[in-house]
From Swiss-Prot:
Gene Ontology molecular function: ATP binding; GTP binding; molecular adaptor activity
Top-level division of the source organism's lineage: Bacteria
The organism of origin for this protein: Vibrio cholerae serotype O1 (strain ATCC 39315 / El Tor Inaba N16961)
Name of this chain's protein: Nucleotide-binding protein VC_2532
PANTHER family to which the protein is assigned, alphabetical: RNASE ADAPTER PROTEIN RAPZ
Binding site for GTP: 56-59
Record family assignment: Belongs to the RapZ-like family.
Amino acid sequence: MRLIVVSGQSGAGKSVALRVLEDLGYYCVDNLPVSLLTAFIQSVQGSQQNVAVSIDIRNLPKEPSLVQDVLDQLKQNNDVSMLFLDASKETLLKRYSETRRIHPLSLSQSKPSLAQAIELEKQLLGPLKEQADLLLDSSNQSLHELSETVRMRIEGRERKDLVMVFQSFGFKYGLPTDADYVFDVRFLPNPHWEPDLRPLTGLDAPIKSFLEGHSEVMELKQQIQKFFEYWLPMLEKNNRSYLTIAIGCTGGKHRSVYLTQQLGEYFAQLGHQVQLRHTSLEKQQS
């Protein structure tokens, strides 16, 4: 039986993650106290159905190490992993403002402000975040985008082969926090300064022709390919389920999109499990 423990900051998307897991066939339980987790797993052990349980700030034990003790015990007979959802303070403030919901810690005796409650929760969940097998940052993601990200990562972990996630992004939108490797390609020739090319993206043939006409672009692509070809066997031996490679340019529209697509297709042709995401491009087109 497989158990996924879902945790994270209030407002970061735990309920979204649980809905996705339910769609994937998991038996889901929301806000189960840690003290009841072992007994609950024992009660469903015979069903052979995968299970997902959410744990949040309201049902955490006072001693954070108790969570790890329970998970370590369950790992002896089950496939256990933890999914932790995070988001920036600005994103959480905006979400609470839009939904007008009350933060769980705002109901405590000290009655902290929303900003103070978010900071306090971040500190309290710190030890849990460090134990996470899968960390997702939902900042600036829509419900649909977050659902697709969760689905992609969970389905990737269910496969035994390492999944290579190639992700393009724009630095002006911020760094992706869940990347294992980040390549800054802003030094490459920029199609943005060509009026005829500016409206296009790195997926369009004229952009490909422009970039492939510069030797430094092709050299960088080959060096990245060689780097991962050499080290991928070691990464696979390290019991990883996925590897996220983020490639960024200024706006995430031309150079990073081209390289991300090319690298993803290259490793897919070699027989690797590959997932492609053009995060900034998706934002611009939505």
